[in-house]
Amino acid sequence: MYRIRVFGDPVLRKRAKPVTKFDDNLKKTIERMIETMYHYDGVGLAAPQVGISQRFFVMDVGNGPVAVINPEILEIDPETEVAEEGCLSFPEIFVEIERSKRIKVKYQNTRGEYVEEELEGYAARVFQHEFDHLNGVLIIDRISPAKRLLLRKKLMDIARTVKR
C-alpha cells in the first residue's frame, strides 16, 4: 500500500510525464494503487497522489477498477453540473466543483492498447478530477478565492503534515 501525498507536497503541483513502459512494474504499481484507493475508500487515485509523477490513474465508479494511462480528453460537453467533491490529498475537505456532464476520452490500458469511450455523470466527474491531478491541478484551484480563504486554516493544517 502507498502513503497518500497531501496538500503541500510538491509532487501534486507538477505536470506528470507520460508512461512509456508498459511492463510488470507498471502493473504492480497499478495493483498497489487500487489496493490503496480501496483502503482509503476512494473512487479514484492518481499516480502523483502516491508520489509518482507519471500520467496514469485508477478509478472505480461501481463497475470494477480501471487503469487509465496517458489519458486525453477529446471532447467536453458544454453542459455542466455542480457537485461536492472530496480528495484523498485533502483529508476531510469537501467542496462544490463545476464540471462537464459528459466527456469523450482516450487512454491506454495496461497492455498499451488505446481505449476510446464516452463518460457521463459520476464517471465523467471522477475522470476529470483524476485527470486534473496529472496536470498539477487540485480541487482548491477550481473554487473561488473567497471559498479558498474560508478553507485556509484547514489547508495550512494539512500542509504542516507534509514530510520534507
Swiss-Prot record:
It catalyses: N-terminal N-formyl-L-methionyl-[peptide] + H2O = N-terminal L-methionyl-[peptide] + formate. The keyword Metal-binding applies. One of its GO terms (molecular function) is metal ion binding. Its cofactor is Fe(2+). The active site is at E130. GO terms for biological process: co-translational protein modification; translation. InterPro entries: Peptide_deformylase, Peptide_deformylase_sf. It is an enzyme of class 3 (hydrolase). Fe cation binds at C87, H129, H133. It comes from the Bacteria. Keywords: Hydrolase, Iron, Metal-binding, Protein biosynthesis. Its EC number is 3.5.1.88. NCBIfam families: pept_deformyl, PRK00150.1-3. Belongs to the polypeptide deformylase family. PANTHER family: PEPTIDE DEFORMYLASE. This is Peptide deformylase. It comes from Thermotoga sp. (strain RQ2). The gene is def.
